Amino acid sequence: MSIDLRDIGYRIAQNDHSALKALYDHFSNSFYQLALAIVHSAELAEEIVEDVFIQVWKKRTRVAEIENLQLYLYVTTRNISRSYLRKYKNKNFINFDDVQLPYYKIEV
């Protein structure tokens, strides 16, 4: 599926939430894969993609001026991913789903 990025950019600049959703639906998986390749954490990759689109919305008044929106999103994803790596470089993460919690039987 192809989308008109120039039109999407203009619509986002005019506060069109559906245009942002269309942009997200079109690119989120690709940029998730990019972020995942950089940070090696599904949870962080999801957060990064959310941050990318939040940043687009915060800067929406200038989105129409971006010459190559796809490249802009790619570079933004890469930069935010690298920023997360610096921020969490020495942190160890455990996936909550992998944690074995003790089982307690409660009788009523």
Spans of model-derived segments:
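Short, charged helix-capping/linker segments at alpha-helix termini
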Residues: 13-21, 33-51
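Arg/Lys-rich amphipathic alpha helix in sigma70-family domain 2
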Residues: 61-65, 75-95
